[in-house]
Every structure is written in structure tokens, then in C-alpha cells.
């Protein structure tokens, strides 16, 4: 028997190193010049990737950012949880804007479906939690992953067998309606109405459904480059994030293998995305926090400025993001977990005009000095940040495309981030448009 073909294409994983919203969408779009396929491997439509192309803003939630490049194939892997309603709404929005989607989008038959009862449970739980809410987007992501782990999930391929789908749906509704009515004080969902809503999606999805794992292997064997587009960020990872204030999937680079069906040896370069400062949406500890719109005790003027200049509002929820200084100790944890090859720093221009810039390089935790983010939200909440201070710069970095054009103080700040992180900065984003980028090392070439 002959050995499997060795990958000839080069694969890059783009991963968030913070609490999401790092600017991954723009970077994926920029790098897609050198990739023939872009893959989503986890999460659902709770993550919004914002792209500014030619001054026009596009927000993608499910479909990979590569869809904005003509001729690039886009894949939704088995690790994603899929809302057909959200998917087709996004497809309609893109195609009405002249973007061809259906002929370029491929969906794994093993992808877990989000059903109406997942959304109902998600919203009802947050209401019941009250002040202790996690801060989910209410889109059914967590409950869908729960069903997957409990081995009762319905998958895309199940839509192609209506009798089987109906049987499994009835079983699931019996279970979830009990939870809704008896524990969450929510009305039961109707079986027939749910079935009638879901079954027609089978015919609409069928032309896009394929064996994604096999197609990715074949693409690499043919010499094509692939990009794996992470959603959310490392500090929201179900295992490695600030648990329990996390998302319901693994957001780290290693999950690109499991969530798309490729071997881990096929992940050749890990590009970690970090803002020049930190943001977080929803609840959970944030050691270097300066500003939280919902917390009167967190109204530092610099944090307010970061939020306003950086336009820090959730692209999916519209919720204001909490802001703070860049946390290099948390970044160090993310780099280790992901095996990051190089960093891309985004939104450097948001720091323009600040007299002083701070960088969190460690913490005091229960009287001890540590230089890496601890595990678990309780420990993180007790961390007191240890800062280094840097002089700011008054000249604008917006839109710059060359390292030498950066102010010397900005260069010094970036070099110190590299030193603390222990890996090089490969790219710097100086604005929202794809061309407002400084390239130092190319993930597909260096």
C-alpha cells in the first residue's frame, strides 16, 4: 500500500490571543491573496469578523472572511455549530452585494446544527442567572455544543433523512421542553412547527455539503495553500480561558486539526493576532482593565478614549467592549498554548496621541509575583497588574505601510512587546482597510 500524499501546500492558522475582537477578519482577508481556501473550524454565528474593503464595511459571522476574495474556496468544518437561518441570511446579504457565495462555500456533513430550542435555552438561562450571567450572545451556541458532547446533536447530514431527523427531533424536544418548562419557566416549543422550519433547509444546504476533510487533504496535495480562521480568542477557550466566563468551543490553534479534519502536522504557521491594547465583551475578570461602560468604578479616561477611538462595540451584539492596557502576561500564556509562530498587532493607531502607554508584564497574586496568566477566573480576578511605562507618540501611525515610518517611541514599544512575548511581530495593522498594513515577515513565505 502506498503512503498518503505529503502536503505540498502551506497552511496558516490565524488565531486570536486575547478575548476575541482582535481584528482577525481583516488579517485573514489580507493573507487570502496567498491562500486558495479559507476554513472556519469552531464557533458559530456568535463571532463577527469585520472587514473594510475600499471603504465599505462587511461583517461576517459564519462564512469565512476569504469569501470577499474572488475565486477563493471557503469551508465550514465539522467543529462549527451551524444555524441554517443565520447562514442563509448571511448568504443573501453577500449575494445581494454582488458576492458569489453558494458555488464557493463547502460545509461539512458532520457539522452540528443549531435548532430553535438551543436559542430558547440560551436566552432563558441568561435571564435566570440574573447578575451572575456569563454574557452569551443568546444565539444557541453553548446549548448546541452541549448536545454535541451529550451525543444527541442533530447534524447537517441528518436533514437528508427526514424520517430519522423527525424521530431524533421528537426525542430532543421531549428533553429540552422539560428543561424549558420545568426549570427555566419558558413555554414549550412545538414539534411540528420546529420540524417544518428545519426540514426545508436540507434541500437548500445540499449543493454546498461535502466531505470537507477529504477536500482539504486533496487541496493541499494539489499544492494549494489553506488558511484556518479562528473565531473568538484564546482567553475565551473552553479549556484554557478564564473559565467559566468563556465560550463553548476550543478557540486555540490545535483545534484547527480536530475542527476541520486535518492532521496537526499540516498546521505549518500559527499567526497570533493581538490588539495594541486589550478589550473584552461581557462578564469575567480583566486584570489590566481601565473602562467598563456598565461599571461606575471602571471609568478611567484613557480607557474611555481607547473605546471611542477604537470604536469598541461588538460587531454582532453592538455591546460596548471593556478596554484596558495590553496584557503581555496573558499574551505569553496564549503564545504557549497555541505555539504561535509570529504576532500580528492590530489597532496600533488607536494609541496615537497618548502621552504615556502602559504594558502589563506580570501580576501580584496573593503576595507573589508571577509573569503568566493563571488558570481559572477566581485566580485571574485576584491578579494585580504590574506595568512598565513607555512614552507615547504624537505623530499619526494611521495607514502607515513601512516599519521605518513608525515613530521611534512606537518602535520601542513594539520591540518590548516582542521581548516579553518571546516571539517576533510579523505584521502590524495601522488601519481597518486591507492595505493599511506593515509586513515584516510573511506567514506564507518566511
Curated annotation (Swiss-Prot):
Entry binding sites for substrate: 315-321
Co-factor requirement: Mg(2+)
One annotated GO molecular function: adenylosuccinate synthase activity
GO cellular component: cytoplasm
GO biological process, one term: IMP metabolic process
Catalytic activity: IMP + L-aspartate + GTP = N(6)-(1,2-dicarboxyethyl)-AMP + GDP + phosphate + 2 H(+)
Pathways per UniProt: Purine metabolism; AMP biosynthesis via de novo pathway; AMP from IMP: step 1/2
Residues making up the signal peptide according to the UniProt record: none
Keywords, in A-Z order: Cytoplasm, GTP-binding, Ligase, Magnesium, Metal-binding, Nucleotide-binding, Purine biosynthesis
Catalytic-site annotation from UniProt: 21 (proton acceptor), 49 (proton donor)
Primary location: cytoplasm
Subcellular location: Cytoplasm
Family, as annotated: Belongs to the adenylosuccinate synthetase family.
Physiological role: Plays an important role in the de novo pathway of purine nucleotide biosynthesis. Catalyzes the first committed step in the biosynthesis of AMP from IMP.
NCBIfam families: PRK01117.1 (NF002223), purA (TIGR00184)
Subunit-level organization: Homodimer.
Full protein name: Adenylosuccinate synthetase
Protein source organism: Ralstonia nicotianae (strain ATCC BAA-1114 / GMI1000)
Amino acid at each position: 500500500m502506498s503512503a498518503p500524499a505529503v502536503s505540498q501546500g502551506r497552511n496558516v492558522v490565524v488565531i486570536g490571543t486575547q478575548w476575541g475582537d482582535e481584528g482577525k477578519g481583516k488579517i485573514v482577508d489580507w493573507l487570502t491573496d496567498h491562500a486558495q481556501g479559507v476554513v472556519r473550524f469552531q464557533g458559530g454565528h456568535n463571532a463577527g469578523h469585520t472587514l473594510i474593503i475600499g471603504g465599505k464595511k462587511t461583517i461576517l459571522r459564519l462564512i469565512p472572511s476569504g469569501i470577499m476574495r474572488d475565486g477563493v474556496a471557503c469551508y465550514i468544518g465539522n467543529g462549527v455549530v451551524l444555524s441554517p437561518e443565520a447562514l442563509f441570511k448571511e448568504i443573501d446579504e453577500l449575494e445581494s452585494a454582488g458576492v458569489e457565495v453558494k458555488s464557493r462555500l463547502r460545509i461539512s456533513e458532520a457539522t452540528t446544527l443549531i435548532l430553535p430550542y438551543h436559542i430558547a435555552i440560551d436566552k432563558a438561562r441568561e435571564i435566570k442567572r440574573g447578575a451572575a450571567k456569563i454574557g452569551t450572545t443568546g444565539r444557541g451556541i453553548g446549548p448546541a455544543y452541549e448536545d454535541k458532547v451529550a451525543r444527541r446533536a442533530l447534524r447537517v447530514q441528518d436533514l437528508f433523512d427526514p424520517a430519522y431527523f423527525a424521530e431524533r427531533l421528537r426525542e430532543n424536544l421531549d428533553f429540552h421542553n422539560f428543561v424549558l418548562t420545568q426549570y427555566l419557566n419558558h413555554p414549550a416549543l412545538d414539534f411540528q412547527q420546529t420540524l417544518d422550519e428545519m426540514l426545508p433547509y436540507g434541500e437548500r444546504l445540499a449543493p454546498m455539503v461535502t466531505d470537507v476533510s477529504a477536500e482539504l487533504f486533496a487541496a493541499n496535495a494539489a499544492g494549494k495553500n489553506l488558511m484556518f480562521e479562528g473565531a473568538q480568542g484564546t482567553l475565551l477557550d473552553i479549556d484554557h480561558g478564564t473559565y467559566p466566563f468563556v465560550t463553548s468551543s476550543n478557540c486555540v490553534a490545535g483545534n484547527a486539526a480536530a475542527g476541520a479534519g486535518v492532521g496537526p502536522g499540516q498546521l505549518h504557521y500559527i499567526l497570533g493576532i493581538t490588539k495594541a491594547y486589550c478589550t473584552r465583551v461581557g462578564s469575567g475578570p480583566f486584570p489590566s482593565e481601565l473602562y467598563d461602560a456598565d461599571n461606575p468604578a471602571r471609568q478611567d479616561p484613557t480607557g474611555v478614549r481607547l473605546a471611542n477611538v477604537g470604536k469598541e462595540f461588538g460587531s454582532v451584539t453592538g455591546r460596548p467592549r471593556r478596554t484596558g492596557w495590553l496584557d503581555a502576561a496573558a499574551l505569553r500564556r496564549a503564545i504557549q498554548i497555541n505555539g504561535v509562530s509570529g504576532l500580528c498587532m492590530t489597532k496600533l493607531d488607536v494609541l496615537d496621541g497618548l502621552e504615556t502607554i502602559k504594558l502589563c508584564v506580570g501580576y501580584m497574586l496573593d503576595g507573589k509575583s508571577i509573569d503568566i496568566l493563571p488558570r481559572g477566573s477566581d485566580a485571574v480576578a485576584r491578579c494585580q497588574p504590574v506595568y512598565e511605562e513607555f512614552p507615547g507618540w504624537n505623530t499619526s501611525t494611521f495607514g502607515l505601510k513601512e516599519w521605518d515610518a513608525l515613530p521611534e517611541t512606537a518602535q520601542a514599544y513594539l520591540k518590548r512587546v516582542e521581548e516579553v512575548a518571546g516571539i517576533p511581530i510579523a505584521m502590524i495593522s495601522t488601519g481597518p482597510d486591507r492595505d493599511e498594513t506593515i509586513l515584516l515577515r510573511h506567514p506564507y513565505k518566511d
